[in-house]
């Protein structure tokens, strides 16, 4: 489960409205341009207070604009229109959203909507917090180069579903287990640990039918440490890793919805911290798969949202997820709903509903495109970013 008090939350209606504006406003410009040519937390988190004081959403500082602004790329910021041109896309379509300008990027795969001065963006209606709020420089929208490389490029400019082009072995990690029960259902004496295991078993059957070789980190009610879960994936030379959880905001019963997590890229601030430390200079083994992580999280999250219209809490990035940090493969963590919300707890308690969750995940993962038994291609440039390169 995840404490919902940090990060960005907005209604799906707002996302839909932005997409409608983007699709309506960009059609003409596109034609014109065409004509022109707990067990998942870090060990450090385990020593934190059981109930940390509420902290406001992390707002990473925005680097200042160049001293002599111009419509040119800088060391840390790049013009959005130039990036679009380099990737064969139409120029950004202005949306004119008050109080700050908005822009839509139309592609054959969908629409990406952002606003200057705000970190929250949308890709096909799904929330994606950027690492840095886009800026206006010399009258043009600029994005931080890390967001261009680590967010836009994987979602818009990258090869679709590259996470499938890997070895066909996948490890499914049912969260919690044994004396680590996870969160308790608001409806009674049922716990997260049993629901995650049932979800994983259902998913195992479906993925096996699709051609994946599937291993579960646990197949019964036992406790596993973080290091054991990571070592299990290493032992089986997994190509993908999925950790399954259910959320809680107890005693608050109103919070609801789905969240999907991947590791924060080096150099960015996390969109969720839960009050724990978040050093952007840190690099972990899983940061070598930043692009695949985001693509995997995106496909899985969009598929899960189709299950009875869950509230969209977005694709999030966090650095304190110890079960992801040490993975040498694309890896994500899914929060499949709130056991502290009576309506969602009733759904989660229904085996038919857990089957739908499993089917949604299996649909998103599809069939593996087996090319070799080697691990997925690593992004070597993401492995080390010096502290000097992060300083202003």
Regions found by a protein language model. Give the residues of each.
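Primary recognition of N-terminal secretory signal peptides and signal-anchoring hydrophobic helices
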Residues: 29-191, 195-198, 203-206, 210
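Residues embedded in well-ordered secondary-structure elements
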Residues: 14-15, 161, 249, 323
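A residue-level detector for conformationally permissive "hinge/kink" positions
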Residues: 9, 17, 117, 167-170, ...
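Active-site-proximal helix/loop segments of hydrolytic enzymes
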Residues: 190-374, 379, 385-392
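Short, basic, low-complexity termini and linkers enriched in Ser/Thr/Gly/Pro
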Residues: 3-18, 53-65, 367-392
